[in-house]
A protein has these predicted regions:
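Conserved beta-strand hairpin/beta-sheet module of binuclear metal-dependent hydrolase folds
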Residues: 1-58, 90, 181-197
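Residue-level signal for inorganic ion chemistry
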Residues: 6, 236, 261, 312
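Metallo-beta-lactamase
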Residues: 35-37, 42-45, 139-148, 164-258
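Active-site HxH/HxHxD metal-binding segment of metal-dependent hydrolases
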Residues: 42-48, 56-160, 187
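Histidine-centered divalent metal-coordination motifs
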Residues: 71-77, 95, 174, 178, ...
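Short, contiguous alpha-helical
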Residues: 86, 171, 313
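C-terminal regulatory/interaction regions
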Residues: 263-333
Length: 333
């Protein structure tokens, strides 16, 4: 589907779930430099078919894609990139930080699982609940064939195909090496999962997230606020505008979440797991109690709670103590 002149959005379905889609974007070149593909979808037959059909519908050819840019290395954005490289010989570009965690995330996965398990234990998850929280994400790795990038991007780099010229904006938070692509002349931006139309992107603490991912994320949002943008092309959902208003709403959400955490701490020391149990969570547009969440959503709720606690500690509103191997938090005000 053409969303702007020379820019086509292709919805890539998740394996076995056609309603969960990732937006890939094809950026046309009119002078023979080759098209740019931004994000690829999962490494599945359904994803490949959807991509091929979307390219055909745009009257383009897959073999004319010469550059694949990945906004971040989560499976739904990065998984198919290796196969695309094989098919059309495209150059793969990923931010340096995400490029450097491909190996531990996808090839040395058992070591990462051990680190996640220890992190969840330290933050109060009972031993009998650990297996389901860990297993909730293992299926995703089946749909990623790790691909080594040809180019490791940095903040401020330029990507061009002769028709479009993008500035690479490093926007950590959702992933430590997440990037957005800003087309200054045409005033549009591809935001990956950094800014979405009506969903607050997941920002959780984990062994690969960096020390304070929510602080990084908020700084990245403020970085985008300064841009002149007419159209936002996100990694999920529809194209939209009013970037400043959307950022304001996301920031309000995180302020509300911090207030909810502070309320939960007023009656004493708690682990992140205990805090997550006391906070309402939004799932599919509705408020859901922690006990009713899926295993995957519970894990995200816990890691998001840790991320907010890390930020509250930086703001000197929360203190942290270790007690018998558990990480406990206490409100300062």
């Amino acid at each position: 589907m053409r969303v702007l002149n020379g820019v086509h959005q292709i919805k890539i379905p998740a394996p076995g779930n056609a309603s969960w889609t990732t937006n890939a974007y094809v950026i046309e070149s009119s002078n023979g430099h080759g098209h740019i593909l931004v994000d690829s979808g999962w490494d599945s037959q359904e994803s490949l078919w959807a991509l091929q059909e979307g390219i055909r519908a745009a009257n383009l050819k897959l073999r004319d894609i010469k550059t694949v840019v990945i906004t971040h290395i989560h499976p739904d954005h990065y998984g198919l990139s290796s196969k695309i490289k094989q098919i059309c010989g495209a150059q793969l570009a990923i931010h340096r930080i995400d490029a450097d965690i491909i190996l531990p995330r996808y090839k040395d996965f058992n070591d990462l699982v051990k680190k996640i398990t220890v992190m969840l234990q330290q933050n109060g998850v009972p031993d009998d609940e650990l297996p389901q929280l860990i297993d909730a994400s293992l299926w995703m790795n089946k749909y990623v064939t790790p691909a080594t990038p040809d180019v490791k991007l940095e903040d401020g780099d330029t990507i061009s195909n002769g028709s479009f010229k993008f500035e690479v904006l490093w926007t950590p938070g959702h992933s430590p090496g997440h990037i957005c692509l800003y087309e200054q002349d045409r005033k549009f931006i591809l935001t990956g999962d950094h800014v979405l139309y009506d969903t607050n992107p997941h920002v959780g603490f984990n062994p690969q997230s960096g020390d304070n991912p929510l602080d990084d994320y908020i700084s990245s949002l403020e970085k985008l606020e300064r841009l002149k943008v007419h159209f936002i092309l996100p990694g999920h959902g529809p194209v939209f505008n009013a970037l400043g208003l959307r950022i304001e709403k996301i920031l309000q959400h995180h302020e509300e979440r911090k207030r909810a955490i502070m309320r939960s701490l007023h009656d004493g020391l708690k682990t992140a797991y205990e805090i997550a149990q006391q906070i309402p969570w939004m799932v599919n547009g509705g408020s859901t109690a922690f006990r009713d969440l899926s295993a995957w959503d519970k894990r995200m709720a816990i890691t998001e709670s840790i991320a907010h606690l890390k930020l509250l500690m930086k703001e000197d509103r929360v203190s942290n103590v270790d007690m018998d191997g558990a990480s406990l938090y206490l409100a300062k005000d």
